Amino acid sequence: MARFAGNAGGRRKGMKAVLISIRPKWCEKIISGEKTIEVRKTRPKMNPPFKCYIYKCGNGKVIGEFLCDEIININGAGRIPSDAARPTCLEPAELHQYLRAATGFGWHISDLRIYDHPRDLWEFTGLRQTKYGLAPGPITRPPQSWRYVEEEIWNG
């Protein structure tokens, strides 16, 4: 895991990325390296790899980022490939209860970077779907699960 000063230097806009809300308990397991797969009911309509910014619920800050380099399908019974079950930090019953017999997705976490200085939501530009495509706009509240944002490329 790399640490860097996320607010240093200038920035420029990049490609589409994801802002993902994660509870403090799971953030700690991600930071420790124990949790390397984040389970979600949905996934972005883009192929890996893509950047994900971690919004830590409770403190209201973006604490870091990771590269989602693989998406693992979890079938409707909450079954996950055996080699992928442990890195979710979920018991089979928890996984089944969360997905409620629906299909889910395991987002693989790689290239984790935790910011020395957590960032505010207003520093990010959201992307919303319009009839003309994706349009940029301010983020006024955190996503319930995840949302598209513009990728920030920090210099310095």
Residue ranges of predicted features:
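Structured alpha/beta reader/binder surfaces that contact nucleic acids or chromatin modification marks
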Residues: G10-G156
